[in-house]
């Protein structure tokens, strides 16, 4: 399918900022890896800085040259399936025409500057990562900077894609002591979590964020206890997870349940989908995404993980499993290259 990207626009680099430890991005780093070093450009000046303006120009000129068109599910869907979705839309319907953002602040702010987590998932890290007192102070200082530079205009806060918001001392205290007066234009908070600590007691300890938390992503990557505890979520407790998911299902929050597809779990894609739908019903969207190498695998190890690769010895089995689910409702993915757009069958 021939798609001319000059006819399309992606709004993400024009309204989003993702803050990591010492660096910033304007999209998910695996989808658009260009970064801005905060040691070179201070946080208060970063949003209309030259590197970010350059990224926006690559969207405006239709090249999308910095984007990973395979890993981004929206570009993958457009290029392989001919469907514009999410932040990607037809350019003529958009009012985006300049690489400069008027108020020099993002609408959508991703807080990814604390990697603290109680799990050591092989797809993310090789050991437990927990900030010490110095690291906690750094996290708190960055939150203070956000309060000073961005809080007046930001509309959505995303906490967090780097660790877990309930495990992180800095993020947990931020949620517990959240002051809405500092964020007059805030519409929503999106929580990204493994849900291991998201129980009623924890939720009741942060009442000021309740009306803002309208969406969440829960990263699970397994459909059975064995895979969850021994392969994809090392340190996890399956029964605790299920109990917390049932609690979360009682909240007025839309849920994205995510599953990173790899050699150790692809046989459970259908089981995972059915489990999530049985708990959350129609308010869940289930995402199946290709595993990304965040530096935890050697080249050879990562090749074995990529079960969707046509040269992988189990690729035919992956296709068989994917065929069971890809037409399901409330499901999205970045595996569109395996779908024949003419007769809507797997290639």
PLM features: what roles do these ranges have?
Residues 105-116, 127-141, 153-169, 181-199, ...:
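Core AdoMet radical
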Residues 1-134, 300-347:
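N-terminal pre-core extensions flanking Radical SAM catalytic domains
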Residues 47, 172-176, 229, 245-249, ...:
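Non-transmembrane alpha-helical segments in soluble domains
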Residues 60, 145-152, 175-182, 205-209, ...:
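Leucine-rich repeat
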Residues 15, 70, 75-78, 82-83, ...:
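Preference for well-ordered, secondary-structure-rich cores of eukaryotic proteins
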Residues 21, 156-158, 188-190, 211-220, ...:
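Conserved C-terminal portion of the radical SAM core fold
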Residues 169-177, 200-207, 268-272:
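Distinct, well-ordered alpha-helical segments
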Residues 44-45, 54-56, 121, 125, ...:
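A generic structured-segment signal
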